[in-house]
Amino acid sequence: MRVVVSIGGSVLAPNLDARRVEDHAAVVETLAEAGYDIAAVVGGGGVARDYIGTARDLGANEVQLDQIGIDVTRINARLLIAALGSRVDPKVARDYEDAGDAVRRGDISIMGGIMPGQTTDAVAAALAEYVDADLLVYATSVDGVYDADPSSQDEAQKYTQLLPTELVDVVAPMSRDAGASAPVDLLAAKLIQRAGMRTIVLDGADPQHIESAVLDGEHNGTDIIPPDGKDDLATWVHAEQ
């Protein structure tokens, strides 16, 4: 079974905490040892936003700001690589071909951003499609997909299950609202829809949530299930193993 995990920068490295990085690396290694082909895409988080904000004040244009964000994601990716064992490709993958080659030869592949204008949410979805992954997991700072931004609206309701088309419909208005925060961005949602990719959005602060979702199909997040994916997640996971 082939799995792509997107780990938000604010989940992996909200501050420089070696133990947190080690805990996420341990889950990635556990999945690899269980026989899964694994790739992880790491975001930039608050550090990237801080650098981008300062660079914007200095007059950097949007492409330059994106490049700074990409650099930070790759630094975070290097942190995760440093915590992983001998099965990881020691280089941060710079494109989908590099990541795909590593996965197909049995290595764990780690990548950050790759091009201006594209978030690591979208990179993870595109990578999952490129390597023909069975499952895409978004480990975010939010415990699923809501009908509104839960950080600003107390009445926001969480979805336990969505079709890919419904995910696009939920995320699209958030992408238009200044200051709103969607758990995955609109481009990622559209890529998930195009690929018919089975996807989970969950709270990644505790990396054990990732392990439980992949190994046992158990989590408290949101399942994105393509139209032909009729089984519940636990049944589907065990059937795919």
Swiss-Prot record:
Pfam families: AA_kinase (PF00696). Inhibited by UTP. InterPro entries: AceGlu_kinase-like_sf, Asp/Glu/Uridylate_kinase, Uridylate_kinase, Uridylate_kinase_arch/spir. It comes from the Archaea. Gene3D superfamilies: Acetylglutamate kinase-like. ATP binds at residues 9-10, 45, 49, 140, 146, 149. Its main location: cytoplasm. One of its GO terms (biological process) is UDP biosynthetic process. Keywords: ATP-binding, Cytoplasm, Kinase, Nucleotide-binding, Pyrimidine biosynthesis, Transferase. Pathway: Pyrimidine metabolism; CTP biosynthesis via de novo pathway; UDP from UMP (UMPK route): step 1/1. One of its GO terms (molecular function) is UMP kinase activity. SUPFAM superfamilies: Carbamate kinase-like (SSF53633). GO terms for cellular component: cytoplasm. Coiled coil: none annotated. It catalyses: UMP + ATP = UDP + ADP. Its EC number is 2.7.4.22. Belongs to the UMP kinase family. Catalyzes the reversible phosphorylation of UMP to UDP. PANTHER family: URIDYLATE KINASE, URIDYLATE KINASE PUMPKIN, CHLOROPLASTIC. Homohexamer. This is Uridylate kinase.
